[in-house]
């Protein structure tokens, strides 16, 4: 425990005391007004009641904030909005949007200064670089194949928002700012129920989006900080035998002796022998913990995480939120894919002098399969096909122009291919493309009271071009001089697009 506390104190950021005075600067709220709420209209914003608010209200609001009686009355009478000097309710809407946005911008300053305060000669830790979403796909393609067990974790979130405020006390020691944050959270009674909703932690209200995102990211940063400590403690040397182990002990002692005589000379060489038992990647409120070792060791990891949330974050996590599976015998849901790591046999032909023999080599390969049943269910719900996948027309779109109908169907098809381009078996994607293309043809034929064949002959190649995906367009440019070129067999390799992590729901382009 002492080692953990020392590690925690060593890596904590510098405490900040200057945050609260910035809350009374006008430009902070002007910045929140211009960039946080409505980028297209920097001068004024429009509320849900079609009422416009000018940035001039910022100065009046800051003047009221200097008055102590205003804050006392607001706390004593939370149901009565003391910002309302007028009967039209301008300040109530403005207060609920601009002030939390400005507060979020101010409290983000210490975290941004921590990044710029690092000396140039100091290398950024690799673990921080791997927090990007770009690390997800190399993780699956490379390290994932050499691991044995998988823990699929649904990252919990605090039941009470006071826990989030307490987490900020480790990094921001500006007491007035923390009290003001508590005032915001208590003022809006629906915030606590909103953030603990089981639907999604990412679906924030527009006016509170920045503040909630900051609170949630600060919680994730603190959770991953402790997880990094456990990960470093679980590292071990990759051993081949007991003899190798003894040799490496002697070698490590020699390296330590040389490290004392020549400090910093062999530092990078020692890290070469470190082999973490656990690999971690996070996405969309979930996390994957893939590790080596036995089933018992991975169950201990599960209880490590449960105790971590219980003792350091003061809330209980249900054990069922952490699913432990063996990679060789199970599949898991990942970003809309059904993924698994089966063992496949590779037949290798070897020849030594005049002798020819075959060797069976077992190797692991990541399979990412498109969930056909779920996607066909989405298309059926959107009235593009029946439950069994039979294409039908969409009568609600018959009032649109022909090119609008083609554009909508083509955009849906391209979005599906774009999202699931990392699939190792794309037969399901071509089936979905067939359903959308025939549904489009039937919709157009129904609009013009004609047959499908007649209408497709009238459109010709323009009808097919609307359903070309990004992969097909790129490959068609690369192989323009090739006479025999087939889209179906030319790009079986998986293609990962880094922007698919932003797509939360595939049903959105279907509506």
Curated annotation (Swiss-Prot):
<dbReference type="GO" id="GO:0008033">
    <property type="term" value="P:tRNA processing"/>
</dbReference>
<protein>
    <recommendedName>
        <fullName>Maturase K</fullName>
    </recommendedName>
</protein>
<keyword id="KW-0934">Plastid</keyword>
<keyword id="KW-0694">RNA-binding</keyword>
<dbReference type="InterPro" id="IPR024937">
    <property type="entry name" value="Domain_X"/>
</dbReference>
<keyword id="KW-0507">mRNA processing</keyword>
<dbReference type="GO" id="GO:0008380">
    <property type="term" value="P:RNA splicing"/>
</dbReference>
<dbReference type="GO" id="GO:0009507">
    <property type="term" value="C:chloroplast"/>
</dbReference>
<dbReference type="InterPro" id="IPR024942">
    <property type="entry name" value="Maturase_MatK_N"/>
</dbReference>
<keyword id="KW-0819">tRNA processing</keyword>
<dbReference type="GO" id="GO:0006397">
    <property type="term" value="P:mRNA processing"/>
</dbReference>
<dbReference type="GO" id="GO:0003723">
    <property type="term" value="F:RNA binding"/>
</dbReference>
<keyword id="KW-0150">Chloroplast</keyword>
<dbReference type="Pfam" id="PF01824">
    <property type="entry name" value="MatK_N"/>
</dbReference>
<comment type="similarity">
    <text>Belongs to the intron maturase 2 family. MatK subfamily.</text>
</comment>
<dbReference type="InterPro" id="IPR002866">
    <property type="entry name" value="Maturase_MatK"/>
</dbReference>
<dbReference type="Pfam" id="PF01348">
    <property type="entry name" value="Intron_maturas2"/>
</dbReference>
<comment type="function">
    <text>Usually encoded in the trnK tRNA gene intron. Probably assists in splicing its own and other chloroplast group II introns.</text>
</comment>
């Amino acid at each position: 425990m002492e080692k953990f506390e020392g590690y925690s104190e060593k890596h904590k950021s510098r405490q900040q005391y200057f945050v609260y005075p910035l809350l009374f600067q006008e430009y902070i709220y002007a910045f929140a007004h211009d960039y946080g709420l409505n980028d297209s209209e920097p001068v004024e914003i429009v509320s849900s009641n079609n009422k416009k608010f000018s940035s001039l209200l910022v100065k009046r609001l800051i003047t009221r904030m200097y008055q102590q009686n205003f804050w006392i009355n607001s706390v004593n009478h939370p149901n009565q909005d003391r910002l309302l000097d007028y009967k039209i309710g301008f300040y109530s809407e403005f207060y609920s949007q601009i002030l939390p946005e400005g507060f979020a911008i101010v409290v983000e300053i210490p975290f941004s200064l921590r990044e710029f305060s690092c000396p140039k000669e100091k290398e950024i830790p690799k673990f921080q670089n791997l927090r990007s979403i770009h690390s997800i796909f190399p993780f699956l393609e490379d390290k994932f194949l050499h691991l044995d067990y998988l823990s699929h974790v649904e990252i919990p979130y605090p039941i009470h928002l006071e826990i989030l405020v307490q987490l900020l006390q480790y990094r921001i020691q500006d007491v007035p700012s923390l009290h003001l944050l508590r005032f915001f959270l208590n003022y809006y009674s629906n915030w606590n129920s909103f953030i603990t909703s089981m639907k999604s932690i990412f679906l924030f209200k527009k006016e509170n989006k920045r503040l909630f995102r900051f609170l949630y990211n600060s919680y994730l940063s603190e959770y991953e900080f402790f997880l990094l400590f456990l990960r470093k403690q679980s590292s071990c040397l990759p051993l081949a035998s007991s003899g190798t182990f003894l040799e490496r002990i002697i070698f490590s002692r020699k390296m330590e002796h040389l490290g004392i005589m020549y400090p910093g000379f062999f530092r990078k060489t020692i890290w070469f022998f470190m082999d973490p038992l656990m690999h971690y990647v996070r996405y969309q409120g979930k996390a994957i913990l893939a590790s080596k070792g036995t089933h018992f060791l991975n169950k201990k990891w599960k209880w490590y995480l449960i105790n971590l949330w219980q003792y350091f974050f003061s809330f209980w996590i249900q054990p069922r939120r952490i699913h432990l599976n063996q990679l060789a015998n199970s599949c898991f849901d990942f970003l809309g894919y059904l993924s698994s790591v089966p063992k496949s046999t590779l037949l290798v032909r070897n020849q030594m002098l005049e002798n020819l023999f075959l060797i069976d080599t077992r190797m692991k390969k990541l399979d990412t399969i498109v969930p056909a049943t779920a996607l066909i269910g989405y298309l059926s719900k959107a009235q593009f096909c029946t439950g069994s996948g039979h294409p039908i027309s969409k009568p609600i779109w018959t009032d649109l122009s022909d090119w609008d109908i083609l554009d909508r169907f083509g955009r849906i098809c391209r979005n599906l291919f774009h999202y699931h381009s990392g699939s190792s078996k794309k037969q399901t994607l071509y089936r979905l493309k067939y359903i959308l293309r025939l549904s489009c043809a039937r919709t157009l034929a129904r609009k013009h009271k004609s047959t499908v064949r007649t209408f497709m002959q009238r459109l010709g190649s323009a009808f097919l071009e609307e359903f070309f995906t990004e992969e097909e367009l790129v490959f068609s440019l690369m192989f323009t001089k090739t006479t025999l070129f087939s889209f179906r067999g030319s790009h079986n390799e998986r293609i990962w697009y880094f922007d698919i992590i932003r797509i939360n729901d595939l049903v959105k382009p279907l509506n």
